[in-house]
Amino acid sequence: MQRSQFIETCNAWAGAGRPFLFMIDYEMEQFLIFRPEEAARRGIFYNIKGRTNFAGAGGGAAQEVRDTAPPKFRFEAVPVAFPRYEKAFSLVKKHILHGNSFLLNLTFPTPVETDLGLEQIFHASAAPYRLLSGDRFVVFSPETFVTIGGNTIRSFPMKGTIDAALPDAERRLLENEKELWEHNTIVDLIRNDLSMVAADVRVARFRYIDRIRTHRGELLQVSSEIEGRLGDGWRSGLGELLLRMLPAGSISGAPKRKTVKIIAEAEGERRGFFTGIFGIFDGEAVESAVMIRYIERVGAGKDVGRDVGRDVGNAVGNTSGKQTIGKQAD
């Protein structure tokens, strides 16, 4: 679907109060929009905070998948080779030192070895935002893009993570100066993004802690809540509204336009739907997510996992590399 067709359809369906699922890739070249039942016929299923188009979500097929998933399973990621990461990081650091960017997310695909199928991962995950696109990819994301309820738009940027099992983990995370600097930067960026589409933008909550479960254990994640006020006719302009804020600031960086160009140069390949967005309009409100924690099927029995890392001007190459490699393996 072309960009203009997506905008036209999104505006028309939202304006008429017709529920739909939407998906937009990171590069804003692939635009998908389906009624929930049509998405299901195409093998595209979502579960967004318990709302789903999977027919067996209350039992039946979905329950069968949960029941047959092994209590112990293999899930191993092979992190990107550090020399490759270091080369990209050096390029990013050069741009940061030249003032072209001051916050940039850098990510690479990593092979995943698992005895779980994509559909099993979809059902087994406890993430609030889940998406299964046939045998192409699965997303189990903790990160909201935007929510819209009434005339209020909200975003919840996530920046700052630590292993919850570490001693005094919460204090260490909240008092880390580097984490604070990054979080301040992304909050400012998201506030600016919301200001392009909303009035009276404000930070409603600053740096609160969420707990995220992974198969390796629990993580502490720092988020903030930013909100603004939309005009009464926002549904009839939902397509333009979404696209004006893309790509998501939390997975690109600041300043956004220049940083996106640096990402393309450093990573050397397209992200596709990874770090794009997906969401639902339920006839009145919007719930959407950033497509992080993403596994893609690239061949028979071959999966590639992707998750985000981060680099800033005061980061040390070795530390940031280990952090990104660790996040990709979770």
For every predicted segment, state its role.
Residues 1-330:
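Extended alpha-helical targeting/anchoring segments
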